[in-house]
Amino acid sequence: MRRKSAKFPFVLLPLLLLLGVLWACRPPAEAEKPSAARGGLPRVDHIVVVVEENRSFDDIYGNPSAPYINKLMAQGANLVNHYAVEHPSQPNYLDLFSGSNQGVRDDRPNHTFRTDNLAAELIRHGYTFGGYSEGLPKTGYTGPYNLKTGYARKHNPWADFANVPGSVNMPLSAFPRDYAKLPTVSFVIPNLDHDMHDGTVKQADDWLKEHLAGYVGWAQKHNSLLILTWDEDDTSHRNRIPTVIVGPMVKPGDYKAKTNHYNVLRTIGDLYGLSPLGHAKEAKPLAIWR
């Protein structure tokens, strides 16, 4: 007797084909990124880091020539026991950017490194970075100085790393007016007249208010941060510098824990789930959150 054909395979085949079509039409997965908010840290959409020059904490805190900076200190996390790592300027910029001075102990420019750094790590993990230097003649410029504009490469550490694309080394004029278009992390470097190196405290304070107050107001409503710090206090052994962090996730107040550039770098990295860089591996992230 001839056995009847089983109908089950003919029912199952269209179902499998349908499932295959549905799988092919699924929405594309987002690029894999490390999980943020490591160790209870908040999620932050954008960070802008501004680096000033050569002033101690006592030079700035309560100084009537710096009303805008003192306003930021009052509304943010005011790190009252914060220190640069060393002298002079250039090694501190490298410490803040890469967790190491890369063997540099002077201000002579035009170095080339291929080691890990904040920009390369952000880009490697699917985030973005931008360095905005006032007076930089053009995007990707690698010259040491521009005397007409007050630009100094020694204050621009991302220009020193071969693993950072030249396209992220931009003049301040490229800083977006639409802050939503900012990179994940940006550094803003005023020129020598506006960073307190050659100019006055008042000049720098006025410049900060003109160029960053708009971002600070926007950041409070858009889950973003401003970090304002100094490279060093100039020449003293103590090297205590002002540093203030402002944003909606920050708990305002004076913070007395002893911290330095490595703690700031560690905090930025941890906010985006990056591996700690250089000596930042030994530093704790800042505990300043609501």
Q: Which residues are covered by each model-predicted region?
A:
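C-terminal motif of bacterial Sec signal peptides marking the signal peptidase cleavage site
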Residues: 23-24
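Bacterial N-terminal signal peptides that target proteins for export
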Residues: 2-13
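Flexible, surface-exposed loop/gating regions in the mature catalytic domains
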Residues: 33-290
